[in-house]
Amino acid sequence: MAGAAPGLVPVIKGNGYGYGLSRLAQESADLGVDTIAVGTAREVSEVREQFPGDIVILHPWEASSDVARELAADDRVITTVSRADDLARISELVSRPRVLIEVLTSMQRHGLRPDDLDRVPTLLERLRVEGWTIHLPLLADGRYAEAERLARAALEAVPAPLWFSHLPPEEASALARQLGGAEGDPVPVRLRMGTRLWLGDESARATMATVLDVHPIRRGERAGYRQRVCPADGWIVVMAGGTSHGIGMEAPTSATTLRQRAIAMATGSLGAAGLALSPYTINGKKRWFLEPPHMLSSLIFLPRKEKPPAVGDELPVELRLTTATVDEIVTS
């Protein structure tokens, strides 16, 4: 992956994709890249000791942020600017700051509109423009055409490297050649990559949880904070992992296909009935929560016919790693 991406810029933000910011900064240093990208200005301090190169701040510059203003003067930091007025303002506050200028895409999140691009050349003497940044949506339909259209508009205003998010390496390389012309050199392109780089190969990792306790329980008995009535004879398996680890934390579904909508409807109906499938696998099957997860542990119901796990066993648990906080990372 690292070798295929032109000008790879690893993205290290938020919870570090489950691994932590400092660990991914060190991994990036080991990859030999010259630049990484963090999400916010405050994340710079968590990675700069582990990574010796340049650090891009993805969140647009805010004049009201003391940290952002201070870092704009740091020669190792490249600040993203998404408004024309902020380009003028940052150039007044800081002597020739290093900036990436964001172009508004169909995501409609941040960026200069096409009719603002002609304001950039008037500020060039007061800025060090490291490139144009184009953050594309995830959908493949129309992605390449949008990238080409915006890139051409940006390059017409100021020739500079193009930094892309969510553009496959092969498309980025093809676009660089296309923009360079039949006889010209490819336009310099850099690819930011986060989820695909750190979480792309699911076979390279496993998330496990420890069995903390096991209790027999009979139908009609109550258990848990909410004193839920047990639906049948079975076992209460107390598993490590709760809301503080990301258990039970789920992003809203996009539900773009009929299958996804059907799953969302079924899940909602079960939730309304007080039933929620847990991410824990016991004896080869995901099992039901007895009640919503606690902060550090979860109560799982296992039917009596099943053999219960032993205290201390480690069992698979499915986690959304972008919202997870794990207790330990073991490298094998």
Q: For the regions a protein language model found, what residue spans apply to each?
A:
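Active-site-proximal beta-alpha core segment in soluble small-molecule metabolic enzymes
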Residues: 6-157, 161
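N-terminal basic/disordered segments at the start of proteins
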Residues: 1-2
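Active-site anion/phosphate-binding pocket segments in diverse small-molecule metabolic enzymes
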Residues: 10, 97, 145-332
